[in-house]
């Protein structure tokens, strides 16, 4: 993959209605927020640019933010707005709630897309994952310019992307697992494994934990 050959668009403007209106991209799974995990996958894959279509958030270095017009107009409008900022010839279009998406998955999508207009993941049942794909930027721009509905499937399906089926290793969570419902979120947190609450000050800290933190961790049954 050539440096600078692809960028990332993260669609993060949903209302989280199935999660009781919670700020879904800001929910924590494992040691990080959902949106930070997706952004980290893009950075690790060598993305030249990461554009988030959604509210601005602190703590996401190297990320630019845009808002669809009008706000809340839906994913197609958000994609249209974000594409106006895209500068790379290829762009990954991703949901903001994919805690197990990794750089290796994005690299696989980018490689598969080389032979066509784009490539998307399919899950273990063969269902297309429209918000886990990589596309020719100009192809998307042309498609969205002439599209006046609000369905991503209706927009992207006719482009006939390459379907990429990745088989996770035993015990590895699937990269397409999203967090649309409370049940999805619980499953993702279970798969991510036990972690200490943020107030303990661990997170991604590089300094060794204090004795008090170690004791609390032992009481909670997790590693410090």
Question: What is the predicted function of each stretch?
Answer:
Residues 2-130, 142, 148-149, 160-168, ...:
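Nucleotide and nucleotide-moiety/phosphate-recognizing core
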Residues 136-153, 208:
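Short, positively charged, low-complexity/disordered linker segments
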Residues 82-83, 117, 137-138, 157, ...:
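General N-terminal targeting signals
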Residues 16, 134, 202-206:
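Intrinsically disordered, low-complexity sequence elements enriched in Ser/Thr/Gly/Pro
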Residues 129-135, 177-178:
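Short glycine- and hydrophobic/aromatic-rich loop-to-beta-strand nucleating segment
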Residues 2, 150-224:
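Conserved alpha/beta core of the MobA/IspD/sugar-nucleotide pyrophosphorylase nucleotidyltransferase superfamily
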């Amino acid at each position: 993959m050539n440096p600078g050959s692809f960028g990332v668009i993260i669609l993060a403007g949903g209302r989280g209605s199935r999660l009781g209106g919670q700020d879904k991209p800001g929910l924590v799974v494992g040691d990080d927020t959902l949106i930070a995990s997706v952004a980290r996958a893009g950075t690790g894959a060598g993305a030249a640019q990461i554009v988030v279509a959604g509210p601005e958030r602190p703590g996401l270095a190297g990320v630019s933010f845009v808002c669809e017009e009008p706000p809340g107009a839906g994913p197609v409008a958000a994609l249209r707005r974000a594409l106006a900022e895209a500068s790379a010839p290829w762009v990954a279009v991703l949901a903001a709630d994919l805690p197990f998406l990794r750089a290796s998955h994005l690299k696989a999508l980018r490689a598969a897309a080389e032979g066509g207009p784009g490539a998307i993941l399919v899950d273990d049942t063969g269902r297309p994952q429209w918000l886990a794909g990589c596309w020719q930027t100009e192809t998307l721009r042309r498609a969205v310019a002439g599209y006046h509905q609000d369905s991503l499937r209706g927009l992207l399906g006719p482009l006939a992307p390459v379907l990429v089926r990745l088989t996770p290793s035993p015990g590895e969570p699937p990269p397409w697992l999203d967090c649309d419902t409370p049940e999805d979120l619980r499953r993702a947190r279970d798969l991510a494994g036990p972690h200490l609450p943020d107030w303990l000050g661990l997170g991604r800290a590089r300094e060794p934990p204090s004795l008090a933190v170690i004791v609390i961790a032992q009481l909670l049954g997790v590693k410090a």
